[in-house]
Amino acid sequence: MSAAELPPVVVLMGPTASGKSQLAIELANALDGEIVSVDSSLVYRGMDIGTAKPTPTERAAVPHHLIDVLDPSEVFSTGRFRDEALALIADITARGRLPVLAGGTMLYFNALLRGLAELPSADPDLRREIETRAARDGWHALHAELARIDPPAAARIHPNDPQRLQRALEVFYLTGRTLSDLCEGSRSPELPFRPLRIVLAPSSRAVLAERIAERFRRMLEEGFLEEVEALYRRGDLNETLPSIRAVGYRQAWGYLQGDYGFDTFVERAIIATRQFAKRQCTWLRKETEATWLETGTPGLSDRAAKEVRARL
């Protein structure tokens, strides 16, 4: 089958607070589609306000997938995302509908569109050794070690992200090659679909920065801190879990632990979200084949639907 004959899939990418979720709903309505979330935080139940999760009404109007599939105590790997997304794409297409992939987790998009590197399996003994060193010296010391071994990976991985930090060190110890080298050398897979790429982004960083601040203040008014308090009171969650490391949640957790005051929490959360958006925008610059649309443009959904129809 030639590339032109492959079933089409809308791939809607953009930084946080750019309006992707609303545009995805409008596209799905216009094109008889179903939405597949490409967001590492929307998979968690009980994390609604801080993730800007589509409302029950919105999800009832348009089918959404990969939302509310895990408890916050669980881990959702990139490999699992890829497997489940491919299965959903096949199912939606088989039912004669159009898959609309929408989100901002660029690692997931990259894994789906460009494939996963072939990495060694986890080594329990080595992991225990790394965890013992972390308990003795702290994860920041291990992050400094990773920075010497694999600077690009260290730049991507936060010192307070033990899961990814441990994996990067484990891969190097097992193979003698850095995670960055192995990922760079991975081959692009033959996709079973034809991606129709769309990038939605505000006109400038200043506009995006203001949208982020406004949205976070609105989340606070809607009860975001109370949402995190409910997670905090459970007693079985901690800041090393991927769910609690999500932007905004991590800063709220620190406030609830008494690490800093409310004003500092708000400031840190907004700054962290802006930094996250900057990393997303850097990644999106690679999407030279995508149709770029500006957030807030009059007639945005009509234009996006027209672009997709022209390429179906």
UniProtKB/Swiss-Prot annotation:
Kindly give the Pfam families that the UniProt entry links to this protein.
Answer: IPPT (PF01715)
Query: What quaternary arrangement does the UniProt entry report?
Result: Monomer.
Entry's Gene Ontology molecular function annotations: ATP binding; tRNA dimethylallyltransferase activity
- Leader sequence range is none
Question: Where does this protein hold ATP?
Answer: G14, P15, T16, A17, S18, G19, K20, S21
Which family is this protein grouped under? Answer: Belongs to the IPP transferase family.
Q: Which SUPFAM superfamilies match?
A: P-loop containing nucleoside triphosphate hydrolases
Q: Which reaction is recorded as catalysed by this protein?
A: adenosine(37) in tRNA + dimethylallyl diphosphate = N(6)-dimethylallyladenosine(37) in tRNA + diphosphate
Swiss-Prot/TrEMBL GO biological process terms: tRNA modification
What biological function has been recorded for the protein in this entry?
A: Catalyzes the transfer of a dimethylallyl group onto the adenine at position 37 in tRNAs that read codons beginning with uridine, leading to the formation of N6-(dimethylallyl)adenosine (i(6)A).
Q: Which cofactor does it need?
A: Mg(2+)
Recorded hits in NCBIfam families, A to Z, give: miaA
Query: What does the UniProt keyword field contain?
Result: ATP-binding, Magnesium, Nucleotide-binding, Transferase, tRNA processing
Protein residues bound to substrate: T16, A17, S18, G19, K20, S21
Q: Where is this site: Interaction with substrate tRNA?
A: T105, R127
Q: What is this protein called?
A: tRNA dimethylallyltransferase
Query: Recorded E.C. number(s)?
Result: 2.5.1.75
Tell me the domain of life: Bacteria
Residue segments, region Interaction with substrate tRNA: 39-42, 163-167
